[in-house]
Amino acid sequence: THCISSAASDVYKRQVSDMNAVSGARVYFDCQVKNLKFDEDEENAIYRVIQEGITNALRHGHASQIWITIKKEDTDILLQIRDNGIGCKEIKSGFGTKHMKERIKMLSGVVTFDGSDGFTVNARIPIRWGETYD
């Protein structure tokens, strides 16, 4: 297991830093979760969803700014990836959105997409009970 406040958070921050360096877009990362242990499957799923969200924002949305937020709400982790790109009226189910849904579903979570103002990915993942640091 990994702690979101250190190991996993560092991985996500490095991912964001790498994207800032190569994409020309500005990616902002805000992790408001501390003291949670993530198993490898959770950490990997979140990493891949962030990666796919950034890729979609750049490739399809032509975004210049992307905001990634991870926070805790009740018994869930909320992951939001939002951009200032062109958005879309009709969300097509391509490989990227399909894989995001599959990864979050494997963690018993749900993901929704909104293309009305830029593009937003909202994922809600249940926290596995008892997995917090004191």
Model feature map: region roles:
Residues D76-Q80, N122:
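Short, highly conserved beta-strand within the GHKL-type HATPase_c fold
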Residues D10-N44, I50, I54, L58, ...:
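Helix-loop-beta hinge of the Bergerat
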Residues K89-D117, N122:
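ATP phosphate-binding glycine-rich loop and adjacent ATP-lid/helix-beta elements
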Residues Q65-T75:
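Short beta-strand/loop element within the Bergerat-fold HATPase_c
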Residues D83:
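Acidic ATP/Mg2+-coordinating residue in the GHKL
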Residues A123-W129:
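C-terminal beta-strand of the catalytic ATP-binding
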Residues G24, L58-W67, I91, G115-S116:
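Short connector loops in the HATPase_c
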